[in-house]
Amino acid sequence: MTKEFHHVTVLLHETIDMLDVKPDGIYVDATLGGAGHSEYLLSKLSEKGHLYAFDQDQNAIDNAQKRLAPYIEKGMVTFIKDNFRHLQARLRETGVQEIDGICYDLGVSSPQLDQRERGFSYKKDAPLDMRMNQDASLTAYEVVNNYDYHDLVRIFFKYGEDKFSKQIARKIEQAREVKPIETTTELAEIIKLVKPAKELKKKGHPAKQIFQAIRIEVNDELGAADESIQQAMDMLALDGRISVITFHSLEDRLTKQLFKEASTVEVPKGLPFIPDDLKPKMELVSRKPILPSAEELEANNRSHSAKLRVVRKIHK
């Protein structure tokens, strides 16, 4: 049975407007989710334009088929159920060699967080899962119960940036010797036991960073984003654009670095001109990230950490 996807789209107009949509163009929504960005983008296309929408969650696609029905009837939408790390291969399978723009809304979607049984949330008791693609084999349960101490410390530091990573990994080791850690609540309670009283008084849930780290590991989120954004830059037509929304420092750092590398070039001093093969491919559309408006922040609590970065293709 398909579950409803209740999702408030973050930075909706900014993300799509910054793509400078060409009515007859070919566009990609790399993270379909609740289909808010897709719907707004489609409203800017003529019937000659086309949108390719990626999501690895069948539930998202099922719901988007209802929301986007008027555009589907006109043959303007193609859904691709896959991880966006396969962007280039899947688009080429359909005959697409170039795209005019693409948007990314990175991280976990609100409906996935809100569906208790998906096991993403530390606020709701559920089996440890955290798979965005429910056909994937690696689950949060596997990570928590089967990764050794050193691997747990590595992902907690790298993806959660939690200063208590070693202590939490040790406590998990001790707990699972007694019995497997099976639920989100069990894991959250173990994390709470490690955190000092002053940490527990701080704003935000004490398990937030560790849950983020496990989720990123289960879905290889940063690896997938890195591969996909690089493929997107290769596939962009001249003057095409990429919009990327991030929600935490790791995603933003990755996006910022990829865009910086593609938009700058180091050449020896004294060269009278820059050879074509050394010219940067991309140009930053905005030097600083675009942030949600005060109105959006008030209306949607989940938009607080959102940042939007945009680049434009200026050279093949």
From Swiss-Prot:
One of its GO terms (molecular function) is rRNA (cytosine-N4-)-methyltransferase activity. It is found in: Cytoplasm. It catalyses: cytidine(1402) in 16S rRNA + S-adenosyl-L-methionine = N(4)-methylcytidine(1402) in 16S rRNA + S-adenosyl-L-homocysteine + H(+). S-adenosyl-L-methionine binds at residues 35-37, 55, 84, 105, 112. GO terms for cellular component: cytoplasm. InterPro entries: RsmH (IPR002903), SAM-dep_MeTrfase_MraW_recog (IPR023397), SAM-dependent_MTases_sf (IPR029063). GO terms for biological process: rRNA base methylation. The keyword Cytoplasm applies. Specifically methylates the N4 position of cytidine in position 1402 (C1402) of 16S rRNA. Belongs to the methyltransferase superfamily. RsmH family. This is Ribosomal RNA small subunit methyltransferase H. It comes from Streptococcus pneumoniae (strain CGSP14).
